[in-house]
């Protein structure tokens, strides 16, 4: 695994330097992207959201960072969890978490170094593996209501037709 890491990152050293981040910071941010999406096409867009938020001094507010800091996570992210102070909880801390929360793949590392050029500051799961991206908090809050309502409907449907499958996160606002 270490060998593969250096195979991926050594050719990118110059780009890491140009990014204004250390390799540790690149890998840490890439780990968030790795946990946020499995969609290759979204990685550079999510990178742009996080980088845009960092530039504006906003908290990253990434659910996977909260989950990583919870000792016995039961699959249900609560408002209390969002306010727990850990070195990883980006709802509480400003900037990047203490270190990586996962082993990022090459696509996630490259997404940090070559982010999409967007004005997006927010994203929410569409409950289908992809995300809706927003430029404003107002637009984001509308999207959250839409997709969380759909997610609740899907959870109810799953309760009636099969095993419980969580298709959305617990409301965060």
What is the meaning of each model-derived region?
Residues 1-173:
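Bacterial extracytoplasmic/cell-wall-associated proteins, especially those involved in peptidoglycan
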């Amino acid at each position: 695994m270490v060998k593969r890491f250096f195979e991926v990152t050594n050719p990118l050293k110059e780009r890491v330097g140009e990014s204004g981040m250390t390799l540790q910071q690149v890998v840490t941010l890439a780990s968030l992207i790795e946990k946020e999406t499995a969609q290759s096409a979204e990685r550079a867009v999510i990178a742009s959201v996080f980088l845009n938020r960092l530039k504006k001094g906003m908290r990253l507010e990434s659910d996977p960072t909260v989950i990583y800091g919870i000792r016995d996570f039961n699959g249900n992210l609560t408002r209390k969890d969002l306010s727990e102070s850990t070195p990883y909880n980006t709802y509480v801390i400003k900037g990047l978490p203490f270190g990586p929360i996962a082993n990022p793949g090459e696509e996630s590392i490259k997404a940090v170094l070559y982010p999409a050029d967007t004005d997006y500051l927010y994203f929410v799961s569409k409950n289908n593996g992809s995300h809706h991206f927003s430029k404003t908090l107002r637009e984001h809050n509308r999207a959250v209501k839409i997709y969380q309502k759909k997610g609740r409907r899907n959870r109810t449907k799953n309760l009636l037709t099969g095993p419980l499958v969580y298709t959305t996160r617990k409301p965060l606002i």
